[in-house]
């Protein structure tokens, strides 16, 4: 349940920034693969720019916003609207976290209804300290939600 809480990414990133908790090889991995992530209380100290705002217990793109930070204010830049909002099983979230907004590359992918352009999201699943699986979702939208397709991967 800890890993389902998105603020876990903020914790890992905050510990990474201290340069005291993780080894150098661990920090290199975090720097390469973890999008800079921040606790809600740290938002005012961040540089102006675009950030993703996520509820810490959010799922399937529910309640995700892209916000433009200017000073201590956050203006809505883009919002994710999901189909069947009330059918998405997730805990109620009163807290949010932030991540740097990274513009994604677009890909063309063939799905059951034809060819679509969209974005890929890669995920790694862990069992203990071992990577156990890799997953990929394709979405015609930049923020993947319930419309995303699971994409088979081949390791050759």
Mark where each language-model region is:
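Phosphate-binding site of ATP-dependent enzymes
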Residues: 38-52, 57-60, 66-156
């Amino acid at each position: 349940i800890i890993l389902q809480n998105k603020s876990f990414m903020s914790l890992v990133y905050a510990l990474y920034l201290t340069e005291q908790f993780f080894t150098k090889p661990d920090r290199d991995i975090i720097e390469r693969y973890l999008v800079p992530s921040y606790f809600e209380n740290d938002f005012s100290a961040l540089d102006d720019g675009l950030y993703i705002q996520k509820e810490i217990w959010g799922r399937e793109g529910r309640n995700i916003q892209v916000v433009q930070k200017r000073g201590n204010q956050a203006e809505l830049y883009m919002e994710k609207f999901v189909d069947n909002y009330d059918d998405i099983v997730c805990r109620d979230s009163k807290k949010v976290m932030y991540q740097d907004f990274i513009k994604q590359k677009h890909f063309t992918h063939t799905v059951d209804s034809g060819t679509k352009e969209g974005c890929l999201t890669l995920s790694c699943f862990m069992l203990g300290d071992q990577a156990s699986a890799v997953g990929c979702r394709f979405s015609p939208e930049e923020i993947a939600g319930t419309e995303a397709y699971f994409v088979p991967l081949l390791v050759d």
